Amino acid sequence: MPQSKSRKIAILGYRSVGKSSLTIQFVEGQFVDSYDPTIKNTFTKLITVNGQEYHLQLVDTAGQDEYSIFPQTYSIDINGYILVYSVTSIKSFEVIKVIHGKLLDMVGKVQIPIMLVGNKKDLHMERVISYEEGKALAESWNAAFLESSAKENQTAVDVFRRIILEAEKIDGAASQGKSSCSVM
């Protein structure tokens, strides 16, 4: 097996959309039912995708709102972004658009690995954002999209596998686009 690659992934979104729950479900395989606002946590996990081992460093961020100042640390050495909203919250869906805009302003690249995640899909009766709305938003950003339920462990692993694939796809396109020049 080739040497493992390190990847740093930031998880961003409005408060109480399930960023920490999704991350803990992926890393530890358990759902944390209590809400304890995150300041910033970092988790690590080894995962194999397409025969390649990845050492993931997951930056679970504090919830942002439309007025939050986007910390510059969220743009340094990050290989991919998981933007999370709750399918039960119009506010979180609107705020994720603002966060995306701030992210593009900070990073300065139009093509960055982004995974849009509609979380809490298990709360059928409280749903206010349709699957189609989430998918359309992701397509407008040229981003990957999945809905998830951290509580029911639906697609938590898929979310993190997919962001790795998105990062590798963009890294591959960047390295293919590179040209070299030799001065003799």
From Swiss-Prot:
According to its UniProt entry, the protein's GO biological process terms are: positive regulation of TOR signaling; positive regulation of TORC1 signaling; small GTPase-mediated signal transduction
The name of this protein is: GTP-binding protein Rheb
Role played: Small GTPase that acts as an allosteric activator of the canonical mTORC1 complex, an evolutionarily conserved central nutrient sensor that stimulates anabolic reactions and macromolecule biosynthesis to promote cellular biomass generation and growth.
Binding-site residues for GTP, renumbered to this chain:
16, 18-21, 32, 35, 38, 119, 122, 150
Q: What class of enzyme is it?
A: hydrolase
Q: Which reaction does it catalyse?
A: GTP + H2O = GDP + phosphate + H(+)
Q: Which UniProt keywords apply?
A: Cytoplasm, Endoplasmic reticulum, Golgi apparatus, GTP-binding, Hydrolase, Isopeptide bond, Lipoprotein, Lysosome, Magnesium, Membrane, Metal-binding, Methylation, Nucleotide-binding, Phosphoprotein, Prenylation, Ubl conjugation
UniProt subcellular location: Endomembrane system; Lysosome membrane; Golgi apparatus membrane; Endoplasmic reticulum membrane
Q: Which domain of life does the UniProt lineage start with?
A: Eukaryota
**Which residues are recorded with the post-translational modification Phosphoserine?**
130
- Write out the PTM section of this UniProt entry: Farnesylation is important for efficiently activating mTORC1-mediated signaling.
Q: Where is the lipid attached (S-farnesyl cysteine)?
A: 181
**Residue numbers bearing the Cysteine methyl ester modification:** 181
According to the record, the protein's activity is controlled as follows: Alternates between an inactive form bound to GDP and an active form bound to GTP. Inactivated by the TSC-TBC complex via the GTPase activating protein (GAP) domain of TSC2. Autoinhibited by Tyr-35, which constrains the active site conformation, restricting the access of the catalytic Asp-65 to the nucleotide-binding pocket.
Q: How does it sit in the membrane?
A: Lipid-anchor
Q: Which residues bind Mg(2+)?
A: 20, 38
Name the Gene3D superfamilies on file: P-loop containing nucleotide triphosphate hydrolases
Q: Give the pro-peptide residues.
A: 182-184
Question: Residue numbers for the site described as Important for autoinhibition of GTPase activity?
Answer: 35
**Enzyme Commission number, as recorded:** 3.6.5.-
User: Where is this chain primarily localised?
Assistant: membrane
Glycyl lysine isopeptide (Lys-Gly) (interchain with G-Cter in ubiquitin): where is this cross-link? Answer: 8
Q: Where is this motif: Effector region?
A: 35-43
Q: State which gene encodes it.
A: RHEB
Cite the InterPro entries for this sequence: P-loop_NTPase, Small_GTP-bd, Small_GTPase, Small_GTPase_Ras-type
List the PROSITE patterns hit by this protein, alphabetically: RAS
